[in-house]
């Protein structure tokens, strides 16, 4: 995809059909029927990510809970369709449509969202007409967050500098992947604990584009592009307000026919990184929409799954396992 393609106006679509990955299913019919009567788990990734971020976690959850797990790509991320708008209400409606289409309204559902995906999960939990039983939001609250983490801002800035060609890396050039990864690793915010994994997370939008491996000289003349530099997987040039949208929490006051305040039957857990500023220390703010919400604290920054994988996995497992056993 050329740079010009990234600058084209995105189509307007009220709903898109999200791409997803599903964990293994039982091979025999009787086991499959029983399997699909138990809660489904849906993972929603964070900003600039994709369903791939949950791959290792899903293997563990699947083994421990024998769970049916769906990992989705949010619109404009991964291989899901590219379209506007990209506000939280639209992203939530995409997920609701996914549930209606691929899982159904009656089946119990557990939601697990990281960062931006946490807000999408929380909004979906407030939707009346689907059977959400549990929701985990990893380090993002159900209200506007005025400031973004420097880690997000610095990595986003580097991505945009490469997209704008302030930093030029030729497609198909020797060791171009290494050059990209080293650029992200050199950011001050990525020199902390687990910084290499964070650098890979943000660099992956370049590394995952197959056409970036093909040098201009290897193309037939009619296929050659005026712009020979690497491209990003997301149409960020067509999403100028992305970071502002990520900060927001929608006004639901005029949508009470569809969204309701949280109830005791829908358990909500917030996993907070104590070194992160996203979730305010006043936890009563969380309980405005989710009166029965619980909070678990971790001595980490925003990326607590990377910084403390053992304790964060135990927290997720225990929260989901508690009721799952009742469906045996």
UniProtKB/Swiss-Prot annotation:
Biotech use, per record: S.cerevisiae produces only trace amounts of ethyl acetate. These traces help S.cerevisiae disseminate in the environment by attracting fruit flies. However, as ethyl acetate is a key flavor compound and the most abundant ester in wine and beer, ethyl acetate-producting genes such as ethanol acetyltransferase are relevant for the fermented foods and beverages industry.
Changes seen on gene knockout: Reduces ethyl acetate production by at least 50%.
GO molecular function: acetyl-CoA hydrolase activity; C-acetyltransferase activity; carboxylic ester hydrolase activity
Active site (record annotation): 115 (charge relay system), 139 (charge relay system), 302 (charge relay system)
Keywords assigned: Hydrolase, Mitochondrion, Transferase
Record's subcellular location: Mitochondrion
E.C. number(s) listed in UniProt: 2.3.1.268, 3.1.2.1, 3.1.1.-
Family per record: Belongs to the AB hydrolase superfamily.
Role according to the record: Alcohol acetyltransferase that catalyzes the synthesis of ethyl acetate from ethanol and acetyl-CoA. Can also function as a thioesterase by hydrolyzing acetyl-CoA in the absence of ethanol, as well as esterase hydrolyzing ethyl acetate.
Protein name (Swiss-Prot/TrEMBL): Ethanol acetyltransferase 1
Protein source organism: Saccharomyces cerevisiae (strain ATCC 204508 / S288c) (Baker's yeast)
Gene: EAT1
């Amino acid at each position: 995809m050329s740079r010009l393609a990234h600058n084209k106006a995105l189509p307007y679509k009220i709903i898109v059909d999200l791409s997803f990955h599903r964990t293994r299913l039982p091979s025999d019919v009787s086991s499959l029927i029983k399997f699909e009567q138990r809660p489904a788990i849906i993972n929603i990734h964070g900003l600039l990510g994709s369903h791939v971020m949950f791959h290792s976690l899903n293997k563990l959850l699947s083994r421990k809970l024998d769970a049916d797990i769906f990992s989705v790509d949010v619109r404009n991320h991964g291989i899901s369709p590219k379209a506007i708008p990209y506000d939280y209400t639209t992203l939530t409606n995409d997920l609701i449509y996914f549930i209606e289409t691929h899982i159904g309204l009656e089946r119990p559902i557990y939601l697990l969202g990281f960062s931006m995906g946490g807000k999408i999960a929380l909004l979906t939990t407030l939707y009346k007409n689907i059977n959400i039983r549990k929701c985990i939001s990893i380090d993002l609250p159900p209200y506007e967050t005025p400031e973004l983490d420097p880690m997000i801002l610095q990595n986003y800035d580097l991505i945009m500098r490469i997209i704008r060609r302030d930093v030029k890396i030729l497609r198909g050039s020797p060791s171009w992947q290494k050059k990209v990864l080293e650029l992200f690793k050199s950011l001050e915010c990525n020199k902390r604990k687990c910084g290499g994994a964070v650098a890979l997370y943000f660099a992956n939008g370049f590394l995952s584009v197959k056409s970036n491996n093909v040098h201009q000289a290897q193309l037939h003349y009619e296929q050659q592009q005026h712009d020979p530099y690497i491209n990003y997987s997301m149409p960020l040039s067509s999403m100028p307000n992305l970071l502002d949208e990520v900060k927001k929490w929608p006004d639901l006051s005029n949508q009470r026919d569809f969204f309701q305040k949280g109830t005791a039957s829908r358990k909500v857990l917030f996993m907070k990184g104590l070194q992160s500023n996203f979730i305010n220390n006043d936890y009563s703010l969380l309980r405005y929409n989710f009166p029965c919400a619980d909070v678990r604290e971790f001595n980490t920054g925003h990326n607590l799954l990377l910084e403390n994988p053992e304790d964060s996995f135990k927290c997720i497992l225990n929260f989901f396992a508690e009721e799952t056993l009742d469906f045996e």
